Amino acid sequence: MKVLVDTPVWSLALRKQSKTEADERAVKELTELVRESRVVMIGPIRQEILSGISDEGKFETLRQKLRAFDGEVLTTEHFELAASLSNRCRRQGIQGSHTDFLLCAVSVKGNHPIFTLDKDFDRYRGYVGIELYQERNGAE
């Protein structure tokens, strides 16, 4: 099964500074998913990852590396579902970003779990029917 990987996981993996033990486990899990060719990406996540890289050489290198990952084709239905999911959560007093709900819509339509470190998705889950990816124990 393909897994949608959210920006915070990618950001963690791309950071050079030291990481906590939990961070290291998340990076190790992402590495395994990449090795298994199970990562799927949406354009807005790709954009978030690439935004803010001022060095053109680093930008181009990362852009080329990210091209290895399947890009989910977004349709009108994805955007409409994202709006519907956002509205459903707002009625419950839960707010989130457009990208978060687009990720939820792609997850629901494609039956892809979401690998994220963002705790907001725990709140969305109760109202939008997404599955959150759980790290495997001892991912090698």
Model-derived features: positions:
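A secondary-structure boundary/capping signal
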Residues: D6-T7, I45, L117
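Structured helix-beta-strand junction loops
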Residues: R35-S37, K65-F69, Q92, G110, ...
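A generic structural signal for short hydrophobic patches within well-formed alpha-helices
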Residues: W10, R46-I49, F121-D122
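A general structural signal for well-ordered alpha-helical segments in protein cores
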Residues: V27, I42, R46, F59-L62, ...
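Generic structural signal for small/hydrophobic residues in well-ordered secondary structure
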Residues: D6-T7, I49, A82, S107
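Acidic, PIN/NYN-like endoribonuclease modules and their adjacent C-terminal/linker elements
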Residues: C104, V108-E140
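Active-site neighborhoods of divalent-metal-dependent phosphate/nucleic-acid chemistry enzymes
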Residues: T20, D70-F115
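Short, well-structured N-terminal submotif of metal-dependent ribonuclease cores
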Residues: M1-M41, S51-R63, G138-E140
